[in-house]
Amino acid sequence: MMKQVDMYKRVALIALMGMSLAGCSTVKGWFAGKDAAAKKAQEPAELVKFEPSVKVDKLWSTGVGKGEGHIGVRQRPAVADGKVYAAAITGGVQALDLQTGKRVWEYKPKKEERNDRKFKQRLSGGPGVGEGLVVIGTLSGDVIALNQADGTEKWRAKVPNEVIAAPAIAQSLVLVRSNDGRVSAFDAATGERRWFHAEEGPTLSVRGNAPIVTGPGVVFVGNDVGTLSALALQDGRPLWEQAIGVPEGRTELERMSDVDGAPVLDGTTLYATSFKNETLALEGPSGRPLWTRDHGGAGGPGVSSSVVVVADNAGSVWGLDKSSGAAMWSQAALARRSLTGVAIQGDYAVVGDYKGYLHWLKLSDGALAARARAGRDTLLAQPLVVDGILLVQNTDGDITAFRLAQ
């Protein structure tokens, strides 16, 4: 009888162990399912199918050298007088015909010497173009001015830190923002430094600097502390400073509020965005805010005659009323695709993404209108539209031109 009882105990114990293991398996599967769902929710949105409402033609594509890769400087070309001026990290500077992409001239920088060794100069900031000059900055803090007509070197200057934003040229001055927050002004004819203005930066900031924007007698500078500053063009005197994104939060990461996208000066009104998902419209002469909205991101805004379009850090694109900032529409189909700043081409807003795709959205309602791919490499730089042609540069150093079909 005792043996029979022991046998029943063993059977019961085995049954309990089996139930316990089955329960563990069920709980584990439940958590695994939640983890998979959470992971999928963080993945870039898959591209949705839609019926294009506009046709986009690819005009040309060309490489200008080895691109920025993961350096994160968001290089893009500049355009003047029917020519595209472009640079790559180790590829020099090229002038291309805007309509055909054919090379007009090419500049190869001399190798720099350090500790009795020669290294290729890495061209990172710009180029900027104006007043007969093409100006580029380097990761070593060199500023190189070229003749716009033939690419010959005219002068060199030095700044104390790497240059990762395009220089600006205005009223016989070359204006350079270095990564330490300093703005330096050089004589456009000689390269002699005229003035500089230093801005204190935060402990932690987003990689990238906003290009300098100039107005009549004024220099507008986006800062890593989340402000936009106005300086007097001729001597660098501070005129005003306005917060775009307030650096709030418990950690340095939460407080990041950089203004890294190119501000847009439209008439006398400035439009700027910050990493804090803020967009602000303000008076250029006084810095007085006109409106602010909790939609925006690290990339620059696109401004049309009636709509300000911004892409936020989550990958949603917003259309804001130009006069009031009220949200007119939003488009979430590109969520988490690491969108660029916004360009305006005709009746469409255009953004690029991490897979090299460009997306055209209707300005009227934000609906997807067209899609094209500018190669397989990441697009970080804000697209540029000149004379109806959209230009975009990817991280591999390729530039591609698109036009809306007539």
UniProtKB/Swiss-Prot annotation:
Compartments it resides in: Cell outer membrane
SMART domains in the record: PQQ
Source taxon at top rank: Bacteria
Topology in the lipid bilayer: Lipid-anchor
Signal peptide, first to last residue: 1-23
Lipidated residue numbers (N-palmitoyl cysteine): 24
PROSITE patterns xrefs: PROKAR_LIPOPROTEIN (PS51257)
Cross-referenced CDD domains: BamB_YfgL
Primary location class: membrane
Role, per record: Part of the outer membrane protein assembly complex, which is involved in assembly and insertion of beta-barrel proteins into the outer membrane.
Assigned protein family: Belongs to the BamB family.
Annotated protein name in UniProt: Outer membrane protein assembly factor BamB
